[in-house]
Structure formats: structure tokens, C-alpha cells
């Protein structure tokens, strides 16, 4: 009989804060535990669940919420694949709390480490760890990791999150945690506790909004396999990484080609609605005409209703230049709802656009002009529009050569989109 477990939120938001200077995770935990606080009890419960059960635990990192499991136990890791409905050939990233834990993974027989982290990674670790950077390492013979973590690849991805709470949970659990984003596979990644499907801890919102950058320093030249919170131009300033190559494609890998890292093979980050992405610089009048034609002809609907969009809903997600609702209607905003994300508040304007004898409801969201604000609000916006049951989402893209997070944002959007438009 299948075990049934109710989703619960364990309140640990007070602990989701930067670590004080010159203070270790261990010292912080000993003080917190000695006070017998509700947050300490929640962390102990979560750690015990991770160590002894096959139930995944959602927890906040600085990027997105992760769905964590003990990376050393097959049953525990299988719980992630089951909860996310994730393909088994899509590898997982391992999260650690220290370099010492990485060394334990590289030297499964114990004793003094004989295998060290490759020197090529030292400049990156010095600059970006803890942080939103995942490195690929060789998986040793007799690996401590469950085989499901690597998807039978000879390497594994590992990172040390900058979120002090994430490292605290790993420290208390005393296990490396396999932790993909805590969402059903292919759906937008979660950036607040409310987005997480399984058992989770409410540590508040996440700061970056897109997942970690994945790099491979085992090849020559080294490569960025997935864009994320650390920009490729930042990486190129590190010794040995000046000629780092782009090793990813914004579309999913096809056929039986094995992914080198998480996030490469399958379509990701997709809401239920059809997503139409307009590349940066698209002519505004042409964009509005395209949307109008979809509304009249039903082209924006996944059902392709020949009678148009009478009574239907669409989302418009703006970044740098689009006016509200693409100026499709002079009607005043009927209603404004708020979606909170990372301490910011996203305004969702609800506007009625007349179409002959009927009308279409437009849900308009402005993410801001900076890559940082767009990254923080992107996944929350897609989820909010999903909750409104829109039929199609039209998104204003940004230039992916603007550095830092811009490439990561466009990578996620191209993976989500069914249609790319340049007009």
C-alpha cells in the first residue's frame, strides 16, 4: 500500500538570513539548538526525514527552492524523480555545506584525501563559492552517490549554496543533498514556498530567481553547460577560464544524446499555457498586430479555436519597451492583483480588450527592465498566469548578450516557448 503523507510547511523563515561574519554554520547551529526554538525543531525534523525516509523535503536556496533528498541513498533519490515525474536520465545536482564534504565524495574509501578537486576549479571556488555555481567532477570508483544522481554519467555536478539556511540543513543532516528545483518536471521553477509541491520548509522567497550556472572544467577548453546566476563574462575573468565556451543550446537535446548536466536534455520551465516569445528588438506595431490576429483567429490558443478568443484569457509579460497590454485597448484597468516574490510585489493588471461583440481578458505583468528583476520575477509570473488559466502568454524578450543573468533568462524563456517570433 502506498504511503500517504500530507504536505506541510515547516516555518524556518527566521533562519533564512545571511551568516554573520567570522561565524561558522556549526557555531550558529549550536546556539540555535541550545535555545530550543520552533525553527530548530523544524530543522531537526527535516534532517531526520532526509536521513531516514524516502520523502523529499523542499527548502530554499539563493536561486530557487530545491527538492532535497539524501544523495547517497537510491530510495531517497528515487523519491525526487517520483515527486517531480522527472525522466530518470536527467542527472541531479548535489548540494554540499563544505569543501570537506566534496572531498568525502571524491574519496569514498575515507582516510586522507588522495583525489582532490581539479586545480582548474580553484579560481571559481575562491570567487563564487558559496554561490550559484555548479562544477562537474569525476565520479570515483565505489562512489558514495546513488546511481540515480548521476544518471550513469562518469561525472557529477556539485555546488555549495550561498544560502546559509541551505547549508545549515545540509550540515544538520550530515548528508550531501541531491536537490533539483522543487517543481513538477517541465513546470516553472519555484521561488516561494507556496510554489513547492511536496513537504517543504517555508524559508521565505529566493533571491536570484534562476538556477545555478553549470560549468565543465574537465574538458579543454572548459564550457558553460547551463547559464544561471553567474554570468559567463564573470567566469571569463578567472584564471584558466578566459576562453570558456558556451556548451549549451537554448533548445532541448534530441534523441538519445546524453545530457552532460541537468537542464540540457528536456523542455523545462513551461507553464500550462502556450508561450509565444518575441525576441528583443521586435517591432512594437508588428507585435501588437500578431497578438490581435491570434485573438481574432484563435491562434494564441493551444486549442486553435477558429471562432477566436471570445471569453478567453491571455497573459502579456513586459520587460523593457512594451506599453501596458500592448495598447490593445483604451479601456481602464478593471482590477489589479498582487503576486509577491522575493520581497518584491508584481502587479498583475487585468484589462478587458473588446473584440467585436465579445472581449478578451488580458493579464498584464511588467517585470522591470533589469536582468536581475526579470530573473527574480520570471517563474513567479508564469505560475501566477497559470493560476489565472490563461490560454496563451506573450513575452517580451531581452538581449541575451547583456551579461550576467540575461543569457540565463533567455535560455529559460526559449525552453518554455512553443513559438519564437522576430518581427
Predicted feature locations:
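Active-site-adjacent structural elements in enzyme catalytic cores
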Residues: 1-423
Amino acid at each position: 500500500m502506498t504511503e500517504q503523507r500530507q504536505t506541510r510547511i515547516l516555518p524556518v523563515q527566521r533562519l533564512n538570513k545571511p551568516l554573520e561574519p567570522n561565524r561558522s554554520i556549526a557555531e550558529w547551529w549550536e546556539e540555535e539548538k541550545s535555545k530550543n526554538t520552533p525553527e530548530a525543531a523544524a530543522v531537526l525534523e527535516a534532517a531526520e526525514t532526509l536521513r531516514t525516509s524516502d520523502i523529499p523535503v523542499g527548502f530554499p536556496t539563493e536561486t530557487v527552492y530545491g527538492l532535497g533528498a539524501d544523495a547517497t541513498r537510491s530510495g531517497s533519490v528515487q523519491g525526487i524523480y517520483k515527486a517531480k515525474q522527472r525522466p530518470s536520465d536527467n542527472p541531479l545536482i548535489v548540494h554540499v555545506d563544505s569543501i570537506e564534504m566534496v572531498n568525502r565524495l571524491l574519496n569514498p574509501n575515507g582516510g586522507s584525501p588522495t583525489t582532490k578537486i581539479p586545480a582548474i576549479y580553484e579560481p571559481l571556488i575562491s570567487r563564487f563559492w558559496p554561490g550559484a555555481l555548479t562544477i562537474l567532477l569525476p565520479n570515483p570508483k565505489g562512489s558514495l552517490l546513488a546511481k540515480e544522481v548521476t544518471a550513469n554519467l562518469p561525472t557529477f555536478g556539485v555546488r555549495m549554496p550561498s544560502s546559509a539556511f541551505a547549508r545549515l540543513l545540509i550540515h544538520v543532516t550530515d548528508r550531501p543533498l541531491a536537490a533539483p528545483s522543487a517543481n513538477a518536471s517541465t513546470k516553472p521553477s519555484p521561488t516561494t514556498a507556496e510554489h513547492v509541491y511536496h513537504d517543504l520548509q517555508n524559508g521565505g522567497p529566493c533571491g536570484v530567481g534562476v538556477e545555478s550556472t553549470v560549468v565543465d572544467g574537465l574538458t579543454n577548453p572548459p564550457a558553460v553547460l547551463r547559464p544561471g546566476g553567474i554570468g559567463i563574462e564573470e567566469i571569463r575573468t578567472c584564471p584558466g577560464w578566459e576562453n570558456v565556451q558556451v556548451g549549451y543550446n537554448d533548445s532541448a537535446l534530441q534523441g538519445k544524446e546524453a545530457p552532460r548536466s541537468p537542464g540540457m536534455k528536456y523542455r523545462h520551465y513551461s507553464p500550462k499555457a502556450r508561450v509565444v516569445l518575441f525576441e528583443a528588438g521586435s517591432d512594437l506595431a508588428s507585435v501588437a498586430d500578431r497578438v490581435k490576429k491570434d485573438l481574432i483567429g484563435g491562434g494564441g490558443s493551444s486549442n486553435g479555436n477558429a471562432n477566436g478568443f471570445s471569453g478567453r484569457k491571455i497573459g502579456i509579460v513586459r520587460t523593457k519597451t512594451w506599453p501596458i497590454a500592448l495598447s490593445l485597448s483604451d479601456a481602464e484597468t478593471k482590477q489589479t492583483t498582487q503576486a509577491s516574490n522575493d520581497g518584491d510585489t508584481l502587479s498583475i493588471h487585468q484589462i478587458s480588450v473588446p473584440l467585436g461583440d465579445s472581449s478578451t481578458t488580458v493579464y498584464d505583468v511588467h517585470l522591470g527592465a533589469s536582468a536581475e528583476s526579470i530573473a527574480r520575477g520570471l517563474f513567479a509570473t508564469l505560475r501566477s498566469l497559470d493560476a489565472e488559466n490563461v490560454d496563451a502568454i506573450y513575452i517580451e524578450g531581452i538581449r541575451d548578450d547583456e551579461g550576467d543573468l540575461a543569457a540565463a533568462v533567455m535560455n529559460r524563456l526559449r525552453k518554455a516557448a512553443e513559438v519564437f517570433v522576430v518581427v
